[in-house]
Amino acid sequence: STALGPTQDHTGYGQQTPSPAQIPLSPVVRAGDFVFISGQVPVLDGSIVTGGFAAETRAVLDNVKATLKLVGSEMSDVVKTTVWLRDRDDFPDFNAAYAEYFPSNPPARSTAESRLMIDIAVEIDAIAYKPL
């Protein structure tokens, strides 16, 4: 496979979810052998998931998994995640839930405390490597 050059195209897949708002982004983009997942949030059927921090984290990771599936990829293909937590005190609980989805050979990861765009506790984006 060849490297993606500056003039090569990428392909976006899916429609922006979960909000009916017209947000200019693709949930997932394939660029060569790389798959880029836009920030996923804890929303199911248009509503923010309830049940506490662990439930939100699992919902986000389920959304990452479902979005990867759109391009024939899976969690084991993820090589990097970026995580935003509303409260750094949630870090231990986040790690426990995250480990359920990446039980061995977890991807590289950056985690930051941040005020998020909607009233949620966690958002995650991901980069996967899945050769064509």
Cite the ranges covered by each PLM segment.
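N-terminal presequence-like segments and the immediate start of the first folded domain
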Residues: 1-62, 66-79, 85-132
